[in-house]
């Protein structure tokens, strides 16, 4: 096993939080969000982190000051982020572009990156100190849309952590913002890709018309709530050897499937086996996020470069727990591929129309059988470079019971692969890990990275 960095404890000294406002006057106006943005399920706050080592060429330069100044300049281009969300007619969200600013926290930690362990991966110890939850800042409405904390480390590295209001953007959109911020931090006068609003492109049609059955929003037939579980948060690394072992479980005609498809089907089945559903007929749903910027869901003409709103849908694959556990891996893979095949431009429009017709239905996150998989590798958070080089880690801060998140990762041996972040009840996590161990049969358990809270 990888070192248990959760035993690491350190102190973080924070300066009082401040509001960083745009460096120049910006338009005072209201901007409507799209009907994809406006989903109930996206009215949430999402943390992300990028971590940087010391760079001798940047000696004498303060990442806090550089990023604070760059943030003010970046908000001139991304001025809606400096505003506040309000409820509009029929409860539809809109941005009041007030220019009030975003929360910024300067901090110092008495710890080095090496103390986090050889392989730097979530969940991170003391993360609540690296992204401080400012009292009164966690509202969806009438609150700052971004909270950013930059923490200097004793080794000369630093941690950039951000909490975003998910209704404003998805991972691709946030990556675009962070890269623009980093470009200005490196001395550029403006972001290489200028932001584009155009949320009307993902609004409901007039008249709205639902053209698909959207199982992802339908109430499960059996109630099985997950609220009583004590969760263990873990990370698992899948390099070429692990991914090849999974491919060998499939017949030849499926072996050429994408890495993401194969890994997702495998983890869906492993998770179901680990949960040991008592009711064999309990429904298990896999929602796989598809983005309208690329792939099957891409628009014609494409969404404009610079669009940073939410642009994804999540078609659902459905099976009983019994069938998912008793059938070979190809069964899960075929179900997932069938669900993904629905992901087209028309499907995106149908979701937007559904939000208007049905009053913003939500996902059923609290059901044991619900699982959403989000591939963040295309967001390329590790490429965000404030001048200290690329991040040694960039992406989500942890997985959740209802989701598995994929992050691009290079381990301490230089092997590139995918880090899968998830959370399960303790006993289920032990069974989940055993499923992986039994398949890979590796004596080097450090290849399967695990840490827990």
Swiss-Prot record:
Biological role: Acyl-CoA-dependent acyltransferase involved in the synthesis of lupanine alkaloids. Can use both (-)-13alpha-hydroxymultiflorine and (+)-13alpha-hydroxylupanine as substrates. Lower activity with (-)-3beta, 13alpha-dihydroxylupanine, but no activity with (+)-epilupinine and (-)-lupinine as substrates. Tigloyl-CoA, benzoyl-CoA and, more slowly, acetyl-CoA, propionyl-CoA and 2-butenoyl-CoA can act as acyl donors.
Native organism: Lupinus albus
Pfam families per record: Transferase
Active site (UniProt): 166 (proton acceptor), 385 (proton acceptor)
E.C. number(s) listed in UniProt: 2.3.1.93
Family membership: Belongs to the plant acyltransferase family.
Name of protein: 13-hydroxylupanine O-tigloyltransferase
Highest rank taxon of the organism: Eukaryota
An MF annotation (GO) of this entry: 13-hydroxylupinine O-tigloyltransferase activity
InterPro entries associated with the record: CAT-like_dom_sf, Plant_acyltransferase
Keywords: Acyltransferase, Transferase
Subunit and interaction comment: Monomer.
